[in-house]
Swiss-Prot record:
It holds the Pfam family CGI-121. Belongs to the CGI121/TPRKB family. The lineage of its organism: Eukaryota, Fungi, Dikarya, Basidiomycota, Ustilaginomycotina. InterPro entries: CGI121/TPRKB, CGI121/TPRKB_sf. Component of the EKC/KEOPS complex composed of at least BUD32, CGI121, GON7, KAE1 and PCC1; the whole complex dimerizes. It comes from Mycosarcoma maydis (Corn smut fungus). This is EKC/KEOPS complex subunit CGI121. It is found in: Nucleus; Chromosome, Telomere. SUPFAM superfamilies: PF0523-like. Its main location: nucleus. It comes from the Eukaryota.
Length: 252
């Protein structure tokens, strides 16, 4: 897991973000099961105080952004969306009640229900939250998963990582072969290659270029984007996509 500090001027619950990559998932028994659990949590009854408490506890366990990392071209692509989401959510933060107010897009606030769903929404060029989830969220056919978690700067990182592992599986956590418990990890390698290859210069990215071209209305062939001898096309592509994400707030 990689933890990144965000500006202290943001509300405390947004001052840190944690990213964990999971690979080699079985779509049928893992990806689909996680999606079913998310859907079930949204439908839990809350008529009684006991039911409401149980529903809240289950939703806390699922309080992440669930992304298909093959729809990302790099960590910078993701962090562009994280930053934009944090800015928008800061506008919807109720400091007195210590909650985020949803549905404030018309006044520059949150479009979706949580900061984590706002990250997924920010990745999508369009303004439809459901479309954003379909394009960038975990799907029943996903074989990898990227979890994103906002927290305060004092949150227990190990506890956050453990909650992520409990949700997926320790055997699926993507980490360098020689990484120790407290070794800093650059999640960019996992996003781009699906693992931590010993020779990334000769390893092709796992990014779904065809889908990204379709989503962002680009027509750059994957052969150019995977050219390790000359990565200028990849760098231009990344710049275009990150600019598109950053411009969403301006265009809204």
């Amino acid at each position: 897991m990689e933890s990144i500090s965000l500006p202290w001027t943001l509300p405390e619950p947004l001052q840190q973000v944690h990213l964990a990559h999971f690979s080699n998932l079985d779509p049928a028994t893992q990806s689909a099961a996680i999606i079913d659990r998310i859907i079930s949590a949204s439908r839990l009854p809350s008529a009684s105080p006991e039911q409401a408490q149980q529903a809240d506890e289950e939703r806390v366990k699922l309080d992440f952004a669930f992304l298909d990392p093959t729809k990302l071209c790099s960590k910078l692509h993701l962090l562009s969306a994280v930053t934009q989401a944090a800015v928008v959510c800061a506008r919807s933060w109720d400091d007195d009640r210590q909650v985020f107010r949803e549905g404030e897009a018309s006044i520059g606030g949150m479009k979706s229900k949580t900061p984590h769903s706002e990250v997924i929404y920010m990745l999508n060029p369009g303004n439809n939250v459901g479309e954003s989830l379909k394009r960038f969220g975990l799907s029943p056919t996903s074989s990898s998963l990227l979890l994103v978690k906002f927290s305060s700067p004092t949150a227990d990182k190990q506890a956050i990582l453990q909650s992520m592992i409990d949700l997926v599986s320790p055997s699926n956590l993507t980490s360098p072969p020689t990484a120790e418990a407290h070794t800093p990890i650059d999640i960019d390698h996992a996003i781009r290659y699906g693992s931590y290859p010993t020779t990334p210069s000769t390893t092709a990215q796992v990014t779904d270029w065809k889908q990204l071209n379709k989503i962002y209305k680009l027509q750059i062939p994957s052969t150019l984007l995977n050219n390790k001898q000359d990565n200028q096309w990849y760098e231009k592509y990344q710049d275009i996509i990150c600019t598109s994400v950053a411009m969403k707030l301006v265009a809204a």
